[in-house]
Design a protein with these regions (language model features):
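Structural signature of tandem-repeat unit edges
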Residues: 1-5, 13-28, 38-51, 61-81, ...
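Non-catalytic accessory regions outside enzyme or core folds
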Residues: 177-185, 220, 243
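Hydrophobic/aromatic side-chain positions at a characteristic register within alpha-helices
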Residues: 201-205, 232-235
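Conserved hydrophobic site in ankyrin repeats
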Residues: 212-214, 243
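Charge-dense, extended regions
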Residues: 229-261
Length: 261
């Protein structure tokens, strides 16, 4: 558990909890269980919960990441409940019993009521691609092929480019259950936005991620040079080394010819 305030004499305050890990023994989450955990960003738990109460995440306004560890082959309803409670963009990392992982982004959506004055009634509208992504469950169990199949449809909707980048990157990087057909669709998007993807990974100082991205994309000389310059300015030696090695591999400098007279 991570809190904003720690040390001798510090008083417990659920409003200061930033990251919370639940034990494997938890089987029931009651009504309003995390009420007013206003600083909570990440919830780590096991997929063993069999009952979810009402409004468990009320006023958890910063919570945007669920890390879910499977206990066995049976998938339960935790992910369905989590994404159903959040209309904002959220991320879920699902780790299977064999250690393989899928990291999914569920985009934001909004439910809007507009007053139709002449008819004295309200009209209900849904905006944003996130709503359809919350329908990729069958009997409250995640269907990964359905999630991946939405990608091309998503690109035809109104969406945030940064969100699309996170979706494509995380699904390709943590790719449990990902077919090659769908992997290529995500890969194509990253090839079209390689500069932005490199910038994102530089900001995160993710050396392993950057190395993986370079195996999946085809950055040109100018992209690599710009990224290397940024890594140099950041003082990020590991990232710079990865980029310089990639430059040398893709665009080797010809050896100088010498002659003995």
């Amino acid at each position: 558990m991570t809190r904003g305030l720690v040390g001798p004499g510090a008083l417990w305050d659920n409003r200061e909890v930033e990251e919370l890990s639940l034990p494997t023994s938890v089987r029931r989450i009651g009504n309003y269980a995390f009420l007013n955990c206003r600083s909570l960003r990440t919830l780590r738990m096991y997929d063993g919960v069999r009952f979810w109460g009402a409004s468990a995440f009320m006023n958890c306004r910063l919570l945007d990441h669920l890390h879910l560890q499977r206990l066995d082959e049976e998938q339960r309803e935790t992910l369905y409940y989590f994404v159903g409670e959040m209309s904002r963009e959220v991320q879920a990392t699902i780790v299977d019993t064999d250690g393989s992982a899928a990291r999914l982004v569920f985009p934001e959506y909004q439910e809007i009521y507009e007053e139709n004055v002449p008819h004295h009634q309200f009209e209900f509208h849904i905006q944003g691609a996130g709503y359809v992504y919350r329908q990729v469950f069958r009997n409250k169990k995640l269907a990964l092929p359905d999630y991946d199949a939405l990608w091309k449809k998503f690109l035809g909707m109104e969406y945030e480019p940064d969100c699309a980048l996170r979706m494509a990157w995380r699904r390709l990087r943590w790719n449990a259950g990902l077919s090659e057909e769908h992997a290529e669709a995500y890969r194509t998007y990253l090839r079209q936005h390689t500069a932005e993807a490199m910038e994102m990974l530089l900001a995160e100082r993710d050396g392993a991620g950057l190395a993986f991205l370079l195996t999946q994309t085809e950055p040109d000389k100018e992209m690599l040079a710009a990224a290397a310059a940024e890594a140099r300015d950041m003082g990020a030696a590991e990232l710079l080394a990865i980029l310089l090695e990639e430059q040398h591999k893709r665009f080797p400098v010809g050896r100088m010819k010498t002659f003995d007279l």
